[in-house]
Amino acid sequence: MHIVIFVLLAFVAGMLLHRQLVRTREAKVTAMPPPLSSYEASVTTATFTTMVLETSTDKPVLVDFYAAWCRPCHYLGPVLAEMAKNYKGNFLLAKVDVDAEPSLANTYSIKSMPTVLLFRDGRRVAEFVGARQEHSVRFFLAQNGVLPPAEEAADV
């Protein structure tokens, strides 16, 4: 009798857990992440096409693949965010958490973090791996035709 009750309770607990996992997964897929700033956005598998591929037909999109546990990511992230702000919309900074979006990381063969990809016209056109100082990221952007606003261009 105790075994039957135990099996029944285990079954009910499993069903409740399954329902919660399904709800969590649905919430992740349907929820559009809020922009981090007007020049920066958090991107998911569900929003990648719109926020990266389609946006890159109007302006360059710099995609930062990062992980919360990655120390170099903690250095590069603020550098990229500050540059996105300083470039005043000349590119969009899209951030992808590889732990939350493993299929997206796999699609773009992300093996190390941070990895930064540059998209134009819906295509990946350039990339770099590892943390860089601001001047190095500026050079990378300039090499790929992404320039700061006119008032800052003289300082580059």
Could you say what each language-model-derived stretch is?
Residues 94-106, 135:
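Structural microenvironment flanking redox-active thiols in thiol-disulfide oxidoreductases
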Residues 62-63, 93, 116:
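Hydrophobic beta-strand anchors of alpha/beta hydrolase catalytic cores
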Residues 1-38, 156:
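N-terminal targeting signals for export/organelle localization
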Residues 40-61:
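A short beta-strand-turn-helix
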Residues 59-61, 66-69, 112:
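Short pre-active-site segment immediately N-terminal to redox-active cysteine/selenocysteine motifs
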Residues 72-88:
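Typically the conserved alpha-helix immediately C-terminal to a functionally engaged Cys/Sec
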Residues 111-112, 117-155:
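Non-catalytic, surface beta->alpha helical segment in thiol-disulfide oxidoreductase systems
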